[in-house]
């Protein structure tokens, strides 16, 4: 065996040892840059353009509407004939607290109907939450086991859906409503839905 062949083996061994590390670092860099470049609020939904799920949810016990009457739960008819903003929320959800004042302002817009799906929450906590921030909802249903939210394709709370007059989902916002996405995305989507016949 020649001296050159003996020196070649340690070099080859070093390459074989370093190859997995180099591959790992390359893949890690690829994932980091690909995941970091996307906007998580723009997660596509297979439901866009499809009818809103048939949702029947009982109302939040003891929750009152602005007129002092019990706030109704959610029924399939809630998603037809009017532009409807459906917000999936919970009192234990920190970003839901952040978006609550903006959602309350949207609830003042008489051109749209704001409906809430209370996700895996306790009724007392939901009532306290809405007592603190104001109740923007024309209807609010209890989704105690999360099944109705799954039918809407919810990944986590909060999520907001815009349903057109035709009962079809026009837009989905993943994450909280913020001043930036309210002005840049949600309000234009609402105006587009209102303009549609």
Question: PLM ranges: what are they?
Answer:
Residues 1-62, 197:
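N-terminal targeting signals for export/organelle localization
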Residues 55-84:
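A short beta-strand-turn-helix
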Residues 82-84, 88-92, 156:
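Short pre-active-site segment immediately N-terminal to redox-active cysteine/selenocysteine motifs
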Residues 88-105:
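Conserved redox-active cysteine motifs that mediate thiol-disulfide chemistry
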Residues 90-94, 120-124, 146-148, 176-179:
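Solvent-exposed loop/turn segments at secondary-structure junctions
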Residues 108-145, 157:
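Conserved segment of the thioredoxin-like fold in thiol-based oxidoreductases
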Residues 131-136, 142-194:
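Thiol/disulfide oxidoreductase modules built on the thioredoxin-like
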């Amino acid at each position: 065996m020649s001296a050159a062949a003996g020196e070649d083996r340690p070099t080859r061994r070093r390459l074989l040892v370093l190859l997995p590390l180099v591959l790992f670092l390359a893949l890690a860099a690829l994932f980091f840059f690909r995941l970091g470049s996307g906007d998580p609020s723009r997660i596509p939904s297979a439901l866009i353009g499809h009818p809103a799920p048939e949702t029947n949810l009982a109302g939040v016990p003891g929750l009152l509407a602005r007129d002092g009457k019990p706030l109704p739960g959610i029924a399939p008819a809630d998603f037809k004939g009017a532009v409807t903003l459906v917000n999936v929320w919970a009192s234990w959800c920190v970003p839901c607290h952040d978006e609550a004042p903006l959602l309350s302002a949207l609830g003042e817009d008489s051109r749209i109907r704001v409906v809430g799906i209370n996700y895996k929450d306790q009724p007392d906590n939901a009532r306290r939450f809405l007592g603190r921030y104001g109740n923007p909802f024309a209807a609010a249903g209890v989704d105690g086991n999360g099944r109705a939210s799954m039918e809407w394709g919810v990944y986590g709370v909060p999520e907001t859906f815009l349903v057109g007059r035709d009962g079809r989902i026009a837009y989905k916002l993943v994450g909280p409503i913020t001043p930036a996405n309210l002005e840049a995305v949600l309000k234009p989507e609402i105006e587009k839905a209102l303009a549609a016949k």
